[in-house]
Structures are given as structure tokens and as C-alpha cells.
Amino acid sequence: MDDNKKAMRKLKLHVAISIDGCIAGPNNEMDWIDFTWNDKLREYEDRLHEPVDTIILGRKMTNEFISYWSNVMNKPEDPEHSFAKKMIETPKIVFTKTLNKSEWPNTEIATGDLKDEIIKLKSQEGGDIIVYRGASFDSSLIKENLIDEFYLFINPVAIGNGRTIFKDLKEIRKFNLIESIAFDSGTVLLHYEVKKN
């Protein structure tokens, strides 16, 4: 690679998904997700998030995300405590058309065209960028082919009817498998990168 040409930042999707391809029930139910926090999962999450310095969120997901991790961070005995600290301290960008300024600490607002904003963000100096579950937001990112790596935590459950993230694709997308890890809960992590043409 040309030394003068810097690499783009990677955008990673981190999501729990059922074996029938749903990330939430029809009314956003998530009680079927098993994310048992043990040493193996903690070590993996720490490794995954180590190069990440920006979190992006859709507006609908933001309150829930920040509220959950803020509550965990206030419980030092919680096994997720150290991870929660990283979630709260990592700068966040919320994509919204309804807000002009942030309601949350350590958070900026992005109101422009999604594709333009993400391309601009990926071209800036910095570490990797990560996005979490949010069916409509994730679907938009996937449709625009903006996600570089997928971290799919396949839960051993089929829910039959729910919200998916690949339904808006208009063409076949192919991926390279980078890693797979089975956890004691039966959840399997599949780490894919988008296959370049």
C-alpha cells in the first residue's frame, strides 16, 4: 500500500441473532437472547473492542443502550462492570433526524445523509467503529454496504417471527469467515468480513 494512502477505519456490526435470522421479536422482544457473561465471553469482548474508539447508534437504540450500561457501571460487583465502563467512556455518535443536539454525555449527533456521514467518519483518523443491534439502523447500513465486519452471536433459538437486518438487500452479498467460537451457552460467534469484489 502507498505509505501516503491511509487505511479506512473499519465499521463492525455486533449483534445477537436467532438461528432463523431475527435480532428481535416483532415488538423488539429480546428475552430469548442468552448472553451469559463468563470469562471466555469477557475475554473475547475485550479483544473485539480493544481497537474500537467510536460507537455509532441509531436514535431508537440510544436511550436503551446508554441507560443499560450506565446502570451496570454503577454496580461494581456486576460481572459486566469493566465492559460497561468502556461502553460509557467510548465516544458515541447518534444518527437522528429528530434531534439537533445531544441529550447524553460523551455523545455527538449526526443528522446528514447516512452514507455520506459514515464514509466521512471512516476516512478520519482513529480506531475502529462499532455498531450494535438496531434493526432499521443496521438494515440501512447493510443496504448501503457500509459494514466491513460482522460479529454475529448466533443464539440456539428460533423465534419464528421477528425483526431482521438483511431483508433490504437487493443483491447477493458474500463474506469470508474469519473466526468461529462456540460458547458454553450454545451461542456461536461467527466473525465475517465482507468479500471485496
Language-model region placement:
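Enzymes that bind and transform nitrogen-containing heteroaromatic metabolites
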Residues: D2-N197
